[in-house]
Amino acid sequence: MAFTLHDLAATVDARAASGGEASYTRKLLDKGAEHCAKKLGEEAVETVIAAVENDRNHLMAETADLLFHLLVLLKSRGVTLEEVEAVLAQRQTMSGLEEKASRKRD
C-alpha cells in the first residue's frame, strides 16, 4: 500500500503527542504557529525554485518537505487534514471560477 498524506498526518500527530528532544516535529510545534508558518514559507520558496530550475528530483524532495511543514502548521493551529479535505470536497460542487468568486473577501 502506498504512503499517503494521512499516513504523514498520523506521524505528525504521534510525534506531536510523544515528542522528546529527538523529535523535529515537536521542536517545531514548541516554537509556535508563527515559527511553523515561517518554515512553511521557506519550504514553499525552495519548492518554487526547484520547479523553476526544472529539477524533477529536487522538486519532489522539496514538495515532500512542503507537505510535511504544511501538516505541522495545520497541527499547530488545530486544523486536521480531514477538515481541509472537507473544504476541497465542498469546492468540487462548482466550477473553479464560481468557487473563487464565492469566497468571502477580507
Q: What is the meaning of each model-derived region?
A:
Residues 1-63, 67-106:
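Flexible "arm" and connector segments at domain edges
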